[in-house]
Structure formats: C-alpha cells, structure tokens
C-alpha cells in the first residue's frame, strides 16, 4: 500500500466510526442477543441492536403501514413482522423446495405470497417473530439459508438466466455459487441462533477461535452486490452492482475469463449532493482460474478502505471516488500478486427476459413466465401461487428466478411441454402482455417497506395501463421503453438504470428521470421534480409522441431524448448527476 493510496482512501478515519461499527464489533460474531428477543412475547419486534442484527441473517423488521395509524389510535403496537430473503445464488430452485416454500407462505405469512426479487431470489413478507425459527429450520432442511442476504455483506450473487446457451450458463452459474460461498461469513452465528437455538456468551472460549479472514470481525462497511453476466444479455443489470464478472468466451464458446467491473450502485438521498448513483467501471480482465482470488482481493480492499464513518458514503463507488480507480486497481493488484489484463471486447444489446418458450442447445425447453413486480399470490382470475404449486408438483426440471422478477420453468422435456403450458395458461402464468409491461419493474414499497415515500408495486399496474394507451395512441404499442418505479431513492426498483425512472418523493408524488438506455449502461437524469402520476403521464404523452415521429431506426426512447436535446446525459455521475452544467467535456 503506497502512501499516496493510503492518503487518498482513508481520510474518513479522521471522523468517528458509525454506531453500526460498534454493533458489529460487540455482536459475538453476529449472534447478538437475538435468542433473548425471541423469548420476549410482549412485542412482535426486536429491541436495541437486534433490530439491526437480524439483517445479517437475511431479515428486516417491518410493519403494515396501511394500519399503523389505526393501531396507534387503539393504543396497540404496530403489526410487526419480518421480511426474509433467501440466499439463492443464480436463482435456481428445485420444484420439491418450492412446494415447501409455498406451504410455509400459506400457513405463516400475513400476506400469503412469495415475492420474486430483482436480486434473483424469493422473499417472504409478513412472517411473525414466533415463526422465525421454524422458517429458518425449514430452509435448512431444504438445503437453503438466508445468510448474508442483507446488511454489510456480499448479498445474493446474480447470474445470467440464459436458458439457451445451457453449457455456458451452467459454467457461469457454478462461478456465481463459488463466489457466493467464498465470500460468506465464516461464523457459526446463524446456525447457533436459528438452527441449534444455542445461546452463546461473549465469554465463551471458542469465540476466540472464530475468525473472519475475508470479511473481518466488523464485516464490510456497507452492503455489497455481485453479479456474473454473459453478454450480450444484461439481464442482471450489471452496471448497478459493486462487483461484476463479465464472461468472456474463446472461439470454441468456452468460458476462459472475466472482465471485472466495480463500483456500480443506484441508491442516493434526495437533496444530498454527496450521494449519487453510478455505473460500474472497468477494472480489468482475469483468466477464469483467478476468479476467486480477484473477488476476495476486491472485497478486502473495500473492507479496509471503505468509509466506516458515514454509511451514506460507504459503498464501493465512494471508495473509488476517494482512492481513484487507478489507486483502487493498484491496491487490488498488490493483494492479488498479479496485474489485471486489458479489458476484452464485449457488448450488451438488451436486458429483458425472453418471455415464452425457448429451446436450449440441449434440446430442452424453457418457459419464462412474466410475474408483474415478482409478486406470486392468488388473486381473483389470476391464481399465480396455486399455478406455481401445480407446476412444482409435476415439473421434473428446475425453476430459475430471474433478475427481472420473472420465473423460468426450465429443462422441460419435449413430451412434457404441452402439459406445462396447459397448467401455466390455466392459472394465468401465460397471457397477453405488452412489451412495455414486460420491461417494467417496481420495488415493494407500501405497505411493508419502512423507507417507502410513495407507492410503487401497487401503482405500477395502472401506470403501465395508462402508458400502454399512450404507446398505442402514437402507434408504437409493439415497441417498449424500460420503465421502473421505486418508492424511495434507495434504489431497490433499479429506476436509476431505466429509460423512464420514477423515484418516490411523497405520497402520490415522484421525481421523473429520463435518459437511461435499453442495455442498461447509463444513469437517467431528473427531468421533473415532485410531480404526480397524471402530470408524469401528460409529460410522457408529448415525449413519446415526439419519439414515435422523430426517432431514428431502432432508436430507443432513452437514446432519443438525449439526441433530441430534451435532456442531457449523465456522463460522470460523481460530477454531473446533480447538475447537468457540470458535464465533463469529452475530447475525441
């Protein structure tokens, strides 16, 4: 580590550490006093540090905000429950596992639903505290867990859900699993709390033998997201992750290495110009056999240099700002013991899922079902949850959750194809969906998310209905615009990589961002601030009308609004996300 690198990367050490750092240091390797709270029947939630500690075990405490005020008027505690997010690198799950997951959701979940996430896994909303150990023990029995799917760890690792290139996808999937396992915490805290139910005291001698060689005793400074992706399909929204491995093939189609890109992230804070979303930047190329070494050294560099004083500036993109990309690369190379090679050529052309049937190179069929906002539940006329259960009872392949919140019924034999399609159609898993809707996304937001400022999942269907009408009005109904709504600027709906991105500001009001692109390589800029959905639709009516008439051949909406001068592109978000007048001058 050079003196210049140290100086550029560690200025935050002059400030006091955030309280989360104390919490982690005193947690007995993430055990806390969670078991004591589980025995407390006076509250449906967790107290003190445990409110944060359960996040390391893949859970968040929430409540039903629709009835919060009503319960307060009645002098009742908010209806508290937990969100649990499963660890499922690459998103592959077996039908037998799904059957048990479905049963738990029906029997123990306030909302009787399963939510597919754009982190390529499933989560439960509305699990009462009294059912948490039962839930974790079920996952354990199924060979699953929820370790490190939240808080200051490497989250669920994404992987391209490419059902056509089966052999290459399998290789990429195996690497996603290896990366996930390699970067997991080594503590037995999760098993002690949730499976064994064993209380551990800080004085217990064996704690002195526990070690976290990669993550460290206080783990990472902030959340950390990783993806493995196979061009040309950017279905994992690679540019929004902290660490990305872009698969490179040789002439024979064999996976030979990865381009590594780092520092993507989509969260920011309204009005706080020290925060910004940004796309991942190119670090270099590595041969495939060096993948785990590179992943570890990138993570440990972030562990040691990431800001532990200000959590709003703790993600890897801010570390790059402090160290510079070259300084960060230098430190990673020092730890690896070898240098990155030059980036290999690659290109992304799209990122949506191939809805419907596709045939793989192994002659197996794969059915991708569109699930709006990833919500699998039974509604009148659309019993998706029962449909998935019926498919799980007969399907002999596997299910693949996609990073677009959809699900693939994968590895269907020719002779089983019609039966699978009949079930999917009967229960509404196949239907006539517009291209616009296929390329839409939302976060959960109300009523369960404590950070929600505006509706998202519940607003999306009607908003897309109205936008579909506008598309039809201008004779572009067969085309699409990547459209996303997120209920706050935390970024879960990935609106900061959309062509049209809505970011919740207050109840019924949003900031409208425009200018992302179809492959997902550009941050959209704010076009209008704090406006209502009807006002947004009126703005988009005029803009889509212009796009329909003035666009070049195959020009996406996001590219058009920039070329037409309607909005300026975000060139370097560190500098110009908040002020287009600061766009760096690009020289040829």
From Swiss-Prot:
HAMAP family: CysI. GO terms for molecular function: 4 iron, 4 sulfur cluster binding; heme binding; metal ion binding; NADP binding; sulfite reductase (ferredoxin) activity; sulfite reductase (NADPH) activity. One of its GO terms (biological process) is sulfate assimilation. This is Sulfite reductase [NADPH] hemoprotein beta-component. It comes from Actinobacillus succinogenes (strain ATCC 55618 / DSM 22257 / CCUG 43843 / 130Z). Pathway: Sulfur metabolism; hydrogen sulfide biosynthesis; hydrogen sulfide from sulfite (NADPH route): step 1/1. It comes from the Bacteria. The keyword Transferase does not apply. Its cofactor is siroheme; [4Fe-4S] cluster. Siroheme binds at residue 492. Pfam families: NIR_SIR, NIR_SIR_ferr. Belongs to the nitrite and sulfite reductase 4Fe-4S domain family. Binds 1 siroheme per subunit. Binds 1 [4Fe-4S] cluster per subunit. It catalyses: hydrogen sulfide + 3 NADP(+) + 3 H2O = sulfite + 3 NADPH + 4 H(+). PANTHER family: SULFITE REDUCTASE [NADPH] SUBUNIT BETA, SULFITE REDUCTASE [NADPH] SUBUNIT BETA-RELATED. Keywords: 4Fe-4S, Amino-acid biosynthesis, Cysteine biosynthesis, Heme, Iron, Iron-sulfur, Metal-binding, NADP, Oxidoreductase. Alpha(8)-beta(8). The alpha component is a flavoprotein, the beta component is a hemoprotein. One of its GO terms (cellular component) is sulfite reductase complex (NADPH). Its EC number is 1.8.1.2. Component of the sulfite reductase complex that catalyzes the 6-electron reduction of sulfite to sulfide. This is one of several activities required for the biosynthesis of L-cysteine from sulfate. The keyword Metal-binding applies. [4Fe-4S] cluster binds at residues 443, 449, 488, 492.
């Amino acid at each position: 580590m050079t003196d210049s690198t140290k100086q550029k990367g560690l200025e935050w050490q002059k400030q006091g550490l955030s309280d989360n750092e104390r919490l982690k240091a005193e947690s007995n390797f993430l055990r806390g006093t969670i078991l004591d709270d589980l025995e407390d029947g006076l509250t449906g939630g967790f107290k003190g540090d445990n409110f944060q500690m359960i996040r390391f075990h893949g859970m968040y405490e929430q409540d039903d905000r629709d009835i919060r005020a009503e319960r307060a008027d009645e002098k009742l505690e908010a209806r508290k429950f937990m969100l649990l997010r499963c660890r499922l690198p690459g998103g592959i799950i077996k039908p037998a596992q799904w059957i048990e997951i479905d049963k738990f959701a029906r029997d123990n979940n306030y909302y009787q639903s399963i939510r597919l996430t754009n982190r390529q896994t499933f989560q439960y909303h509305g699990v009462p505290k009294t059912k948490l150990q039962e839930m974790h023990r079920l996952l354990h029995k199924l060979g699953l867990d929820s370790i490190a799917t939240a808080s200051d760890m490497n989250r669920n690792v994404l992987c391209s859900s490419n059902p056509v290139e089966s052999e290459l996808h399998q290789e990429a999937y195996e690497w996603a699993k290896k990366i996930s396992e390699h970067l997991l915490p080594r503590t037995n805290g999760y098993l002690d709390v949730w499976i064994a139910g064993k209380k551990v005291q800080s004085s217990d001698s064996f704690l002195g033998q526990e070690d976290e060689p990669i993550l460290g005793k206080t783990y990472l400074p902030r959340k950390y997201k990783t993806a493995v992706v196979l061009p040309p399909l950017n279905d994992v929204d690679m540019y929004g992750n902290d660490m990305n491995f872009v698969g490179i093939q040789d002439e024979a189609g064999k996976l030979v290495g990865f381009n590594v890109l780092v520092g993507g992230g989509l969260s920011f804070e309204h009005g706080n110009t020290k925060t910004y979303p940004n796309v991942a930047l190119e670090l270099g190329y590595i041969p495939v056999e060096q993948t785990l070494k590179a992943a570890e050294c990138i993570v440990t560099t972030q562990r040691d240099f990431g800001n532990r004083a200000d959590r709003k500036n703790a993600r890897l993109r801010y570390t790059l700002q402090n160290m510079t990309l070259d300084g960060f690369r230098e430190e990673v190379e020092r730890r690896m013991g070898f240098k990155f090679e030059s980036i290999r050529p690659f290109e992304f052309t799209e990122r949506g899922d191939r809805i419907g049937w596709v045939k793989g190179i192994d002659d197996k069929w794969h059915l991708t079902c569109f699930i709006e906002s990833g919500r699998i539940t039974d509604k009148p006329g659309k019993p998706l949850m029962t449909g998935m259960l019926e498919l799980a009872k007969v399907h002999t392949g596997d299910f693949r959750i996609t990073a677009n919140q959809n699900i693939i019924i994968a590895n269907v034999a020719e002779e089983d194809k019609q039966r699978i399609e009949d079930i999917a159609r009967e229960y509404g898993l196949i239907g006539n969906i517009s291209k616009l809707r296929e390329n839409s996304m939302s976060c959960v937001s109300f009523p369960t998310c404590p950070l929600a400022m505006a509706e998202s999942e519940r607003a999306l269907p009607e908003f897309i209905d109205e936008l579909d009408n506008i598309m039809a009005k201008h004779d572009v109904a067969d085309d699409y615009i990547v459209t996303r709504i997120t209920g706050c600027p935390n970024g879960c709906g990935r609106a900061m990589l959309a062509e049209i991105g809505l970011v919740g500001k207050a109840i019924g009001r949003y900031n409208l961002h425009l200018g992302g692109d179809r492959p997902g390589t550009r941050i959209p800029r704010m076009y209008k601030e704090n406006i209502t959905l009807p006002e947004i639709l009126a703005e988009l009516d005029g803009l889509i009308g212009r796009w329909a008439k003035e666009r070049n051949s195959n020009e996406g909406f996001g590219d058009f609004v920039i070329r037409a001068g309607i909005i300026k592109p975000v060139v370097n978000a560190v500098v110009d996300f908040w002020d287009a007048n600061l766009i760096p001058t690009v020289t040829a």
